[in-house]
């Protein structure tokens, strides 16, 4: 409201988003937030306003997390990287997020290096499915393929370590089996390793900015149902669903 009153007020004293000539907008999630504007000078002024507002309440901005950047250079927020490329906004998993998931998968494979294949797959599926679910609405297809490949490399080392005296063909046939046209399916008779590439990318419909989740619950419930239906239809059309890859 503070920013709305300062940057979206008309000459008569009324404030409305249409009066926002400098395009100052706030997007917040928990204690993380971003503020956008049409130029750096306005953002510097906004920063002072925010600092004064927080100081009165005994708070202050984190110096290491606070930065002013151009949208063409990009910035990270909530695990995603936002950047404009040739006039088009691209939202992708951030580099930090990719490093974090890679490290977590590596630690999991290492921790279960002596465990049965079934248990390892269960633990990995919990990680990969959750991460793919979170990033399903952004440009993440190439990232999914990259993480899948890195995980394959980890699992190959895991398998070779367990059988150092066996040849590559024996190791491959022991842990990877053909299924639905895929020759390298890391699976057993009871469970299949989930591949992120099988997660359909489904964009989230833009919000009506005049809607409030506490006052317009029907709108948000309907919006959520529509998105879930789109995801369901997208998966039904996917190769994994049509070939019943995950059906045992």
Q: Where on the chain are the PLM-derived regions?
A:
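Non-catalytic terminal/accessory segments
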Residues: 1-248
């Amino acid at each position: 409201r503070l920013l709305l009153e300062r940057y979206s007020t008309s000459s008569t004293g009324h404030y409305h988003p249409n009066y926002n000539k400098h395009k100052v907008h706030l997007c917040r999630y928990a204690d993380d937030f971003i503020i956008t504007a049409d130029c750096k000078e306005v953002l510097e002024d906004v920063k002072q306003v925010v600092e004064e507002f927080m100081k009165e309440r005994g708070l202050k901005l984190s110096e290491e997390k606070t930065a002013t950047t151009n949208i063409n250079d990009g910035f990270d927020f909530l695990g995603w990287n936002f950047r404009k490329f040739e006039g088009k906004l691209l939202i992708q998993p951030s580099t930090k997020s990719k490093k974090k998931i890679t490290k977590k998968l590596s630690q999991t494979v290492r921790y279960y290096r002596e465990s049965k294949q079934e248990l390892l797959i269960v633990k990995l599926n919990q990680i990969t499915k959750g991460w793919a679910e979170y990033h399903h609405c952004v440009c993440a297809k190439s990232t999914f393929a990259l993480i899948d490949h890195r995980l394959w490399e980890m699992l190959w080392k895991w398998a070779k370590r367990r059988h150092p005296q066996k040849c590559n063909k024996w190791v491959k046939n022991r842990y990877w089996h053909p299924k639905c046209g895929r020759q390298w399916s890391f699976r057993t008779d009871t469970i299949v390793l989930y591949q992120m590439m099988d997660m359909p990318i489904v964009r989230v419909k833009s919000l009506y900015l005049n809607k409030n989740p506490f006052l317009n619950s029907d709108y948000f419930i309907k919006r959520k149902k529509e998105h879930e239906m789109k995801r369901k239809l997208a998966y039904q059309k996917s190769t994994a669903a049509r070939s019943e890859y995950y059906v045992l």
